[in-house]
From Swiss-Prot:
Belongs to the NAD-dependent DNA ligase family. LigA subfamily. GO terms for molecular function: DNA ligase (NAD+) activity; metal ion binding. The gene is ligA. It comes from Wolbachia sp. subsp. Brugia malayi (strain TRS). The lineage of its organism: Bacteria, Pseudomonadati, Pseudomonadota, Alphaproteobacteria, Rickettsiales. This is DNA ligase. One of its GO terms (biological process) is DNA replication.
Amino acid sequence: MADLEKMIEEFTKLRDQISYHDVLYHQKSKPEIADAEYDKLKQKLVEMEGQLPGACVTQDGVGAAPDEKFSKIKHREPMLSLENAYDEQGVERFLSRIKRFLIEEEIEVFCEPKIDGLSFSAVYEDGRFVKAATRGDGFIGEDVTRNVATIKGFPRFLQDVQDRLEVRGEIYINNSDFLKLNKDNEFANPRNAAAGSLKQLDVSITANRPLKYFAYSLIGGKEKSQSEVLNRLESLGFCVNEHRSLTNNLSGMLEFYNKVYNCRYSLDYDIDGIVYKVNDLILQSRLGSTHKAPRSALAYKFSAVYAKTKLNKIFIQVGRTGVLTPVADLIPVNIGGVLVSRANLHNQDEIKRKDVREGDIVTIKRAGDVIPQIVRVDKGSRHADAPGFVFPEICPECGGKVQAEGAAIRCSEELTCKAQIIGKLSHFVSKGAFDIFGLGEKQIKFFYDLGLIKQIPDIFNLEERLNEFSLKEQPDWGERSIANLLNAIQNRRVITLDRFIFSLGIRFIGQVAAELLANYYVSYNNWYNSMIKLLSNDAEVGVGGVEKKIAKSFSDELVGIDGIGEKVAESLKSFFSKEHNIKMLKDLTDYLQILSVNSNSSNSVLNNKVIVFTGKLLTMSRGEAKVRAKALGAKVSSNLSAKIDYLVAGEKPGNKYKKAVELGVGILNEDQWYRMINSEVSE
């Protein structure tokens, strides 16, 4: 359990780190790390998701909130990111997964280079170019219509096009043009130059920059495949990439990768991998998407690089759950265009296993890690008297007792450790939670040290507290900045249930689990009262077997929710068992309006129905069946009880079928299920 908690702590840090770089990258065009390093951060997130229980993982965003300087445009269809793979096994898993999902033995795959540029969306109405937007956070982007219109060769009018057509692609700058543009070293690389050039309030600056683009997607057309989409885009006058291929097997996918990989330096633009897409658009639609990426596409990123440097010092970070994480401070070294100065050492056992010591010469690998990894220690260059690293016996932040939990070392002072309190407060206001603009970790520390924000409810009482404190006398604070912050807090007094649950920072509950809980319980009162009711059962029991039976009832209800596991159930029970958490919830509800879940499928006969699947389905995989059910507003459970509305029974349904008959649960065979969901679509 301790190892899992440690991983979730690291996962949370990574999410916050990515959010920080999202703002620098998407809003300010002033990244502190190169694109390749950012991709590696995202890759680590994917790797950790694979190691964590599904309900624990956090759904990270696909960009950053739109820059306040620009008007906003809401995307009709989200501009999602892509799942990444870094080896052939990852590509093979992708192909196997989509075949299994679709129950198809052979699937045609479209292959194309992944352009290292800035994503855009352009909308045409009756052939006339009317607006363009950046990706933004994937749902809302910046309005860059006038800027895109200045790009040489970008179509302003499309012949013989009616109704609405949306074109998506990537804006970039050629390497040769970048060298001419960047004589004063204003930009780190061509991608940053493209982003900075496009997002100019003065469009004359954009017009004078050598921006180019490739189009790769079309929404609103009648094409049936990705290859047809590219051909149509080309016929309409858009620039499309010449390097593309169709294949129906793994060897063909890898052959295209190797071909492009070997010629990539002869191209006059940067690419950072290959994109694979299911060619058939109907199959793409069936596959659907997760919160952050389409299931029908994969980016196979180029491989890792290595470098040697010196490890200066090992220091300890304390996270919001109290885990002590060792981090290596390195002499900065350039690895494939990325300046690396830190490496994650994970835990005490990792340091002992690798025998890492301060002053060592180490080999760093950069390949999708949260912070690049130390893969080798040059012990031959080590001083004979170099001491081994000694893990602290007390918390370096608060001086409290630490205790070993598996490989993790944890500070036990949850309520008094400053690092943990700051971590929880910072998580509460972070992206994905309350997302309060202008109130990040730096400001949280500032207000904490002043005694103005000591616990979460204090955030919403800050204005009243400032009546007795002259904040404008503090450095960097004036009337305008104070007003902006208070307005930002005021604007976050209404929040959806899933974001509220996530904001609480309950161990093992990321955005995925929070959304599952919100969809199941629908309203805050129902969720809160259900948790309290389940806990009250424990208070009424005696000891021994009876206690175990009642305790299991708490787990039974939660584990029955599709995607929720035992760890989440245990964590919720622990959270609601603590009086200070109950008080915090009551205080927060005095300040907040927590919105109930509003289904987009309110007219569906499956809306808010609870469904259990059993047996083998022939017309679709179990995974696709669950996706289709949830899309129509249903809740999917794995446990059968009298509360279940329908049992969908495939071949060889087993004991669940008999139990459903006994309980009087409605039973649908596969044909009835198939007709039900398809009648919903046709309507």
